[in-house]
């Protein structure tokens, strides 16, 4: 019985030592920082902002024209000075421009959403590749998105290493 107890204790002790020596290490990556601080993320964000500004400028011109026509339609003195056909034409122009504006705005949002999705997919793919390199270099078993981790030691944050690899890859392309 003593031998069995001694063997059980030795077995338990050795399995604990083995488990401690083969502990899987986990790191985290802050995706928001990768998007905001990496060269790729900055480039993609700048291109997205440029596209938004171009759309805003073209929509802005339509808004100005709509506003001008609307002001004329609301000005009783102006409308009384027009012939019935000219007033009807102005109303028709306002309706057509309103419809065109609504269509353009819908297309604008659809294009922006599609572009943003493609941009995020491109960046996420690059972050995944960079994360795999960091995981291998640092001998980690996994790198997780910081948002899904409730608590972890700050030394597990590998975001800077991932950003460095993203920047190196961006400069080489």
From Swiss-Prot:
GO MF, any single term:
unfolded protein binding
User: One Pfam family this chain carries?
Assistant: OmpH
Annotated signal peptide: 1-19
InterPro entries noted in UniProt: Chaperone_Skp, Skp_dom_sf
Recorded GO CC terms:
cytosol
Query: Which BP terms does GO give this entry?
Result: chaperone-mediated protein folding; protein stabilization
Q: Does the keyword rRNA-binding apply?
A: no
Query: What are the coiled-coil residue ranges?
Result: none
What highest taxon heads this organism's lineage? Answer: Bacteria
Keywords noted in UniProt? Signal
Q: Which family does it belong to?
A: Belongs to the Skp family.
| PANTHER family according to UniProt | CHAPERONE PROTEIN SKP
Q: What is this protein called?
A: Skp-like protein
Give the source lineage, highest ranks first: Bacteria, Pseudomonadati, Chlamydiota, Chlamydiia, Chlamydiales
């Amino acid at each position: 019985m003593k031998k069995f107890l001694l063997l059980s204790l030795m077995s338990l002790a050795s399995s604990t030592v083995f488990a401690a020596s083969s502990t899987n290490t986990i790191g985290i990556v802050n995706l928001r920082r990768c998007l905001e601080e990496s060269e790729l993320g900055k480039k993609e964000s700048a291109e997205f902002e440029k596209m938004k500004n171009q759309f805003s400028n073209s929509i802005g011109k339509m808004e100005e024209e709509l506003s001008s026509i609307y002001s004329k339609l609301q000005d009783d003195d102006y409308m009384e000075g027009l012939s019935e056909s000219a007033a009807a034409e102005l109303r028709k122009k306002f309706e057509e421009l309103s419809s065109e504006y609504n269509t353009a705005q819908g297309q604008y949002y659809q294009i922006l959403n599609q572009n943003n999705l493609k941009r995020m997919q491109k960046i996420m793919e690059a972050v995944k590749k960079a994360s795999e390199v960091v995981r291998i270099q640092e001998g980690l078993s996994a790198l997780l998105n910081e948002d899904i981790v409730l608590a972890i030691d700050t030394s597990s944050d590998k975001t800077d290493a991932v950003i460095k690899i993203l920047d190196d890859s961006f400069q080489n392309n």
